[in-house]
Amino acid sequence: MKIFAIGMNYAAHNQELHGTLKRPDEPVIFTKADSAILNQGKPFFIPDHLGRIDYETEVVVRICRLGKNIPERFAHRYYDAVTVGIDFTARDLQKKASEAGQPWTICKGFDGSAAIGEWIPKEKFLDIQRIHFHLDINGKTVQEGCTSDMLYKVDEIIAYISQFFTLKTGDILYTGTPSGVGPVHIDDHLEGWLEERKVLEFNCK
């Protein structure tokens, strides 16, 4: 299983972290190790040696068939389910890596950094590009977004990635985070929502 993720895919998030609303010339793709997966309901143990850890709430899609060099017009055939995930990010390390022109492998891919919710068949949604989602921490909404605000749409991302990587059944794609990211703390209770469906819930320890 491969875990793909896209950075800088919501303009407001780009503004809050990078000071620009500009769409990147190409999708900003990174990957996580399979040991990054944190399944629904499992606690997230905050690493004590990585500095500040931020939540980044994202819509995630699941690849359902083998594909390479997929035309964008056919990309919708290659994923079958949607959920909410958290792309946990070691923010201090990310800043240092970015300033040094280094990759995000550690700051984005450490163990447990890819929380994943309950999968919902994509047919349950009228339009993948019009899904509202949000994250509650300790009962308070801290981040919310809509997939209509993506700079690169899901089908565009899949077509782009498949130029470089063969997509396989079970691969997953984190599609980017809106504005409102922030730190997590021990004893925080996180709940992720797709529309009115709670699909993700766990505690930080």
What are these regions (language model features)?
Residues 9, 13-23, 29, 83, ...:
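Catalytic-pocket segment enriched in acidic/His residues
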